[in-house]
Amino acid sequence: MHASVIAAVLSLFVAGTPQTSGADAEGFIRNWLVLAPIAIDGESGAVEIDRDFLGGEATVRPKAGEEVSVGGQTLAWQPHQTSDYFIDFLQSFGTQRGEYVAGYAVAYVTAPEDMTVTLALSTNDQGKAWLNGKPVFKFADTRTLDKDTDKVNVTLTKGQNILVLKVINEVNNWQACARFLKDGQPVRNIQISAVRQ
């Protein structure tokens, strides 16, 4: 078989497989498990951000394909590899239901040792984040997405950690981004994946 054909086949296989490195050159998480869209009651994301749609959202440990019953519908956790530094929920799930909705994104982060780092993130619109089941971030207003809008010091423990984001969209874009920094630079000695160990 010609080398170019082999390369093309391999590139297709790799493109469809979640990468274990999981982050881009700037450290932004590119591989996630995503669950969406979940309809919210009313039009206030500031109120709905505190609603636990999963009955234990802080401590979820999903696997790809795992189904969840939410608001009378069955949704499955789907692997999502972003095409840019941010998750675009509308790109993932289409625009048929992209306003007044909530979504979750999960990344598994493996650290070689305990380390204190900075979690830099942003959401459009409202957002919450948990690391290993502990709340580390909340934003309850509307906004557009920018890199590193919010920063919080967190501790990654040796082994696999879990980052859970919840993002609510009222109207227009529905996005989020996150990365881990140390002294302002991306943390390089961690592995990020959408696969639970």
Question: Where in this protein do the model-derived segments appear?
Answer:
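Aromatic-lined ligand-binding clefts that engage carbohydrates, nucleic acids, or primary amines
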Residues: 111, 116-130, 163
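Extracellular and analogous surface-interaction loops
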Residues: 105-117, 153-158
